[in-house]
Amino acid sequence: MEIISKSKEERDIYLIPPNFISEGSLFGGMLKLRNAIEAVVFSLGIAVPVLKIAAFSFTTKIIILCLTALPIGIFALIGVGGESLTAFLINFFHFLRARRIVSAETTCVSDEKRTDKHLFPDIGDLPEEFDEEERVSVRKKRKKRQPAEADFFPVEKIENGICYLKDKRYIKIMQIEPINFLLRSAREQRNIIYSYMSYLQISPVKMQIKVISKKADIGSHLQKIQNDIAQEKNEKCKILLMDYYNLIRRIGLKEAVTRRFFMVLEYEPMPGGSKKNEEKEAIAQLHIAEQTARTYLRQCGNEVIEQEKPEEFMAELFYILLNRKKSNSVGFVENAAEAVDEYFLAVDKTDKIEIPISSLVMPKEIKFQKGSYIEIDGLYYACFMIPSDGYKSQVAAGWLSLLVNVGEGIDVDIFLNKEPKDKAQFRLGQQIRINRSKMKETSDTNTDFDEIDSAIRSGYYLKEGLANNQDFYYMNILITITADSVEELEWRSNEMKKLMVSQDLQMKPCYFRQEQAFLSTLPLNKMEKGLYALSKRNVLTSGVSGCYPYVSFEMSDDNGILLGVNRYNNSLIIVDIFNSKIYKNANMAILGTSGAGKTFTLQLMAMRLREKNVQVFILAPLKGHEFRRACHNIDGEFIQISPASHHCINIMEIRKTDQKANICLDGDQRAERSELAAKIQRLHIFFSLLIPDMSHEERQLLDEALIKTYALKGITHQNASLYQQDGSYKP
């Protein structure tokens, strides 16, 4: 294994080697060969005409060259954003040509013109049949013309649990439940990484992992609180529940953030397969891939969420990604109903039409007019990438949690592309030989000696990993930042850059490639070629597993109580300690310094558990008085046991044990025992604690006295004697 580990309890370190040099370069990779050629061409292209001008003196020509050819040559030699100058200029002019506003409005004749105006001024003099024919022709033209959004959105349809793309690909989108990876011990983390590595060995060739952070959807939790309010009979508890409802709603709208994790798998056609049955094969293969991912990720502790309506789930995901602001107030189903109504208004209802998926998920307009950001429905998007040389060579397990849990409005997309092993081994061997030959010709005093040596070490590391049955991957990471204004977008971008620099990482904006980057961030498992070349980083299976991404600090249970807001990622902490599927038991320990709020936390939990109709008992020997006010405010019972108190415990009281749970599990098979005998047995234990040196004769006399005492109240070994005629317990 290519893992640095000193002991079983220390965190493992995983290696992400630098890219071995796969293209022409000079000085051991310091300068790209293409940049050097362009610098020479541009410099000569300016210098030759200037030198041929006879009207200028030689000194004047030198000054002109220093002001023109020299800076352009240096600029071309360095490049722009990791690209050559010509590539940057080509991309810039392509952006100028392609910048536009993608709108949902069609270029067809509007409804007002179609319904209120005739096609000809003198249409009234023509027969009705002619008018109807013209109307039919207009409808046919309208059906042929598609809105700009239909051309922009790359999904053709969503059926059979998969997405059909316009480029004839088939993909499957799955949602994965994260785990709190960083709270696990080093041994547990190692086991999770090994399980994830096992899945990577059999995973598809291309994979996309998408992490979305957005405002938390607290609708289901609020609905449960409303149900509790309707069922609550105590008026004081109803008031508390209303306050709790308003608190959840206020925090959820302003502070609460949630994260969703998705995996996108792509159908891989078999070589030489038939195109006729490709759709059926794609459906079957993607279903098998989903089951495989579910099995292996369960070993890691993650669960693949089973979707009752996978088509609606995938359409809703696209709707959320393309309508972030609108989706907070208008759900997908409601928006789809409105879109269907609007679509039917534009066509004849008698025509048999198929509504495109773009009409259900696309926003009203997308503005691709700026080179550094995109505007969608009043929200601003900026896409960034981690360049090929922007990674740390040594990373800890789960290091991507830094990006995943950074805050609201930060999305992360990870692309994994598995290369053929034989092809990778051939290229590695070839490049190692080239670098070794360069090493022989280079003196150890040259500046490029260390670069070549690093490339050789990286090549040998990758070659050794491939020999140890690991796979060769190219990994790309895109980061999307969203904000409500340009100023906020710039502030978030600068803060994110500072965070990346503090962790020895780099982040570069996708200048004039925002449209391509935005399309790449959609869950379509396809990255634009230019961005792929600029951000790809070679890594082995062990390095990919070290980038385990399904990490979250959230604790948001369905039927829990609110404890607060996580200060690190602004997620709501809603805990249901009685959920045995998540927690091994319902025990808790509250630790903190004096004045940290231990008593307040305990009181808060008790109040909110009572609001959930959970009976709560608090034993507080020293600080019982601090719970008195809260107890009285919800009509609870405050019992003070002390020499001066009027409260006392009746140790002689008998209450029948509730056997409903045992009967539900085992049936009514157990013989009914005497509750009186069980109570007398417990009383013997109580008196033995008071009188430790009690003799056997005294125990027998005590037993007879207890039986006679209960008999005076009409209680015998028959359990029916515990009740009065109305069914209540005897006092």
What are these regions, as identified by a protein language model?
Residues 23-51, 197, 558-643:
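Glycine-rich phosphate-binding loop of nucleotide-binding enzymes
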Residues 47-70, 74-77, 583:
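Hydrophobic alpha-helical transmembrane segments
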Residues 65-91, 95-549:
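Extended, folded cores of ATP/NTP-driven motor/assembly subunits in large transport
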Residues 451, 471, 487-488, 498-504, ...:
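Non-catalytic, charge-rich alpha-helical accessory subdomains
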Residues 89, 212-214, 604-711, 715:
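Switch/coupling segment of Walker-type NTPase motor domains
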Residues 502-586, 598-601, 605-610:
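Phosphate-binding P-loop/Walker A region and its immediate neighborhood
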Residues 1-19:
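Short, charged cytosolic
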